[in-house]
Amino acid sequence: MAGTKTGDFIELITPFLRRKMTELELRHGLNSPEWRAIALQYVKNPLEAAISPQERRRHYESEITIHFRDKPLAGVERLYRRTVLLEPTTVCAAHCRWCLRGQYPVKTLSEEEIVNAARYYGEAEECAEVDEILITGGDPLMSPKLLRVAFEALAAYAPNIRTIRIGTRVPFQDPERINDGLLSVLTSLPDRRIEIGVNVNHPIEFWPESRAAIARLKEAGATLYNQHPLLKGVNDDLAVLAELYSLMRETGIEAHYLFHAIPMQGMRHHRTSVRKGAELAGRLSASGEFSGRAKPHYALMTDIGKIVLYEGAIIARRPSDNTILLRSGYRLEDRQRWNPSWRVPSSVEIDDQGCMCVWYRDGEDEAWSDLGLWAGVNMPSNDSGLPANSAAG
């Protein structure tokens, strides 16, 4: 996540990624599949302006907007029984063009707000079942200082939280940030389980520097996992996915979720159909060409949370607006108990078991033309490896 103040999700590419794009252009050629694998993730594209009236700037709502200890909670979200979420900052090293929170407001929590959140997790009645936190953003590894504050506050006020998960792309965007100072934070709570979700999308991203960063995180005792989107033109291909998951296994990164790309403004050119993702996931799992130990769960991030696409999960289709109705196990009464500020989205229907079903906008498998994709975009030069209109990383 990166956030925006003006509604314009600016392009932000690190010097590390600029160099890698230049190397890919020199080695494979401009517009080669290898170069595109990075450019489609980070280079701002005119197709982001292709927006339909049904598409939204925010995909789902999960913030807890209440006061605790006479102070407003900030950066706290919850959708699930045992897991809470904390966003210390929305700052990222680079801006992923498919970002779930790219259009959210820019914010960074104060130390006091982080401590108040930790007290809430440890003391609030509705958090009695919570034993896991996801620290995300933004990228928490962009601020080791705030991450240390969060670790210390959780140790002091939330002993119920035994697993600390961290979402980051730093190892693949700016791997030099995985330094001794950061590792000292990650090793400061030896009695807690530390898990790091690294979000890697294509095998080309396993650069030597990134492999070294991953090795350092593992040496610090963290368990690494990957959850990432299926992106048209980047990894919507069986051979690419098989190589990606093989490299993950080789470097000690567990497969978690393969997400269908979310239905948000500016995302249409990234989104395949749900069916294509299901077929790719099925071939990974059942073709005999790939180890089942390294396969992901194929999931959709809906208005009510993640839904893993098992047989029977799709219960209806509505061609008029290209949506599908998905069955979930989420009960409305539970959700509103876990998150007192949560409101039922208009996309939700309640089934006869009291569980929520949700309408979800499908994607399309038509390919964009090269001309339409890059029209108006300044390509990276061999000197800088960066589009001339890019922001500094």
Language-model segments: which ranges?
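Iron-sulfur (Fe-S) cluster-binding segments and ferredoxin-like electron-carrier domains
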Residues: 99-111
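Flexible, acidic/Gly-rich N-terminal and inter-domain linker regions that tether
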Residues: 1-78
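Phosphate-binding glycine-rich loops and their immediate beta-loop-alpha structural context
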Residues: 99, 113, 139, 154
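N-terminal pre-triad scaffold of radical SAM enzymes
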Residues: 70-101
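Conserved AdoMet/S-adenosylmethionine-binding subsite of the radical SAM
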Residues: 117-128, 141-290
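Auxiliary Fe-S-binding modules of radical SAM enzymes
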Residues: 1-34, 249-393
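Short secondary-structure boundary/capping elements
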Residues: 68, 80, 112-116, 178, ...
